């Protein structure tokens, strides 16, 4: 396993650990999700380029499209929650708390 793959795996792991640790605020959770998507994009791109997979060359672009959609939905949810409650706590998203 080369150092590039180890660094990408470490970036994904740190983003995932940040998602688990800083899950009280929605903005920090969204940033950790974006870090995870970025490391997956770099991992897919490096793997495709190093193994010369020409048929799978669109996969990183498709992942970026899904990451952009996820970011847009997350930011719209963040704006809605912050306008409604005044904070960006994830606990405000509980539907059982009418």
UniProtKB/Swiss-Prot annotation:
GO annotation, biological process = ATP synthesis coupled electron transport
Under the heading InterPro entries, the entry gives:
NADH_UbQ_OxRdtase_chain4L/K (IPR001133), NUOK/Mnh_C1-like (IPR039428)
Q: Does the keyword Membrane apply?
A: yes
What are the transmembrane regions? 1-21, 29-49, 61-81
Q: Which reaction does it catalyse?
A: a ubiquinone + NADH + 5 H(+)(in) = a ubiquinol + NAD(+) + 4 H(+)(out)
Please provide the record's keywords in A-Z order. Answer: Electron transport, Membrane, Mitochondrion, Mitochondrion inner membrane, NAD, Respiratory chain, Translocase, Transmembrane, Transmembrane helix, Transport, Ubiquinone
Which family would the database say this protein is a member of?
Belongs to the complex I subunit 4L family.
Question: How does it associate, per the subunit comment?
Answer: Core subunit of respiratory chain NADH dehydrogenase (Complex I) which is composed of 45 different subunits.
Q: What does the UniProt record say this protein does?
A: Core subunit of the mitochondrial membrane respiratory chain NADH dehydrogenase (Complex I) which catalyzes electron transfer from NADH through the respiratory chain, using ubiquinone as an electron acceptor. Part of the enzyme membrane arm which is embedded in the lipid bilayer and involved in proton translocation.
What is the name of this protein?
NADH-ubiquinone oxidoreductase chain 4L
Organism, scientific name: Taxidea taxus
């Amino acid at each position: 396993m080369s150092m590039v793959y180890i660094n990408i795996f470490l970036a994904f792991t740190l983003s995932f650990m940040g998602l688990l640790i800083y899950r009280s605020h929605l903005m920090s959770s969204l940033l950790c999700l974006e870090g995870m998507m970025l490391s997956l994009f770099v991992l897919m791109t490096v793997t495709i380029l190093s193994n010369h997979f020409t048929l799978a060359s669109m996969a990183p672009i498709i992942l970026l499209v899904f990451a952009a959609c996820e970011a847009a939905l997350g930011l719209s949810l963040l704006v809605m929650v912050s306008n409604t409650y005044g904070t960006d706590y994830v606990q405000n998203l509980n539907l059982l708390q009418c």
